[in-house]
């Protein structure tokens, strides 16, 4: 099967991990953009749509509704982290991460990195409740470190009884060198993934830092 990818990741400022205000559309234009992109993928012959790295409610529900309009199966991938402020599970947010996933010079870049323009810290359970009430065929966690994943997967299971997927992230990114720093070996990746596979979580992949050798090792051990 061929999957088409859709995301609500915004264009960034040059050399910074901050959405560029010049390219942030209105919600109405954002909706039109998603519908156009989803239909292009459908017309190109994809078998399903995967929504990647959803972090919030407002942008995510617009994207999910646009994807569902195509009539294709929609897999909903979310990203979360355990908040350093109160240990709750929230939509992934650079401010809330206990361990920084982005390495950057704080003297050079004064503005705090952020994924979305609003930079809200949102309870992950609120995101899941909203999106599962809209629809989708598969739900899961992606672009999330192993140590943050278990809480997010549990919340999804509390509100979703359908099939689930899991695509962990295993690297940090150094903005000064533009290099990814792998945080897990192939064996560590495979062993950690195996801990999450169960009757509901059967679709396993990898996000940033995961290579074909990581996935081959997982297949060997499965």
Report each predicted region and the residues it spans.
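Domain-level signal for soluble alpha/beta catalytic cores
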Residues: 1-222
């Amino acid at each position: 099967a061929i999957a088409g990818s859709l995301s609500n990741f915004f264009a960034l400022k040059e050399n910074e991990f901050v959405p560029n205000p010049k390219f942030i559309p209105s919600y109405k234009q954002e909706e039109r953009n998603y519908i156009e992109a989803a239909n292009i993928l459908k017309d190109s012959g994809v078998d399903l749509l995967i929504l990647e790295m959803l972090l919030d409610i407002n942008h995510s529900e617009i994207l999910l509704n646009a994807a569902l309009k195509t009539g294709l199966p929609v897999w909903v991938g979310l990203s979360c982290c355990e908040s350093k402020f109160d240990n709750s599970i929230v939509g992934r947010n650079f401010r809330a991460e206990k361990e920084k996933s982005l390495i950057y010079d704080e003297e050079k870049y004064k503005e705090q990195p952020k994924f979305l323009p609003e930079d809200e810290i949102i309870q992950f359970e609120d995101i899941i409740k909203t999106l599962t009430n809209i629809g989708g065929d598969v739900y899961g966690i992606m672009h999330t470190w192993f140590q943050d994943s278990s809480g997010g997967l549990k919340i999804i299971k509390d509100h979703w009884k359908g099939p689930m997927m899991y695509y962990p992230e295993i690297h940090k990114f150094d903005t000064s060198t533009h290099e990814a720093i792998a945080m897990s070996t192939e064996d560590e990746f495979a062993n950690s993934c195996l801990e999450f596979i169960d009757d509901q979580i059967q679709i396993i992949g990898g996000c940033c830092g995961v290579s074909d050798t990581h996935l081959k090792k997982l297949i060997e051990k499965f």
